[in-house]
C-alpha cells in the first residue's frame, strides 16, 4: 500500500498543474482568505503552486506515519475550517485545489461526505 501511494505521489509530482482549475481555485481561496485578493495574479499562481507542494508534503507525512488518505483529507478540511471557511466554502475550495494540484484521484477516492467532515470537525473543535 505504501509503495502504491509513493508511486502515485512520484507520478503526480512529475506532472504539470491542471490550469483548468486555477481560476476556480483562486476564486474559492478569495472566499476564505480575504488577504488572497490583495495579491497580484502571478503571486496568486505562485501561492497555489506552493500550496500544492505543501499538500503533497503533508500527504507524505500522513503516509509515513501510517495514516490513511481519508485522514489526510480530514486534516485538509479542518485546516481551512479553522481559518474561518464555512463547510461549503471549504468543500468548494478543496475539490478544484486537488484537481489543480493533480490530486484528483486522491480526493475522488478518499473524500467522505461534507456532513461526515463537518461532524468530525465539530467533535475536535469542541
Enumerate the language-model features and the residues they cover:
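Immediate post-signal-peptide N-terminus of mature secreted/exported proteins
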Residues: 16-53
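Classical Sec-dependent N-terminal signal peptides that target proteins to the secretory pathway
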Residues: 1-18
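Intrinsically disordered, low-complexity segments enriched in Ser/Pro/Gly/Ala and basic residues
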Residues: 12-15, 39-41, 112, 124
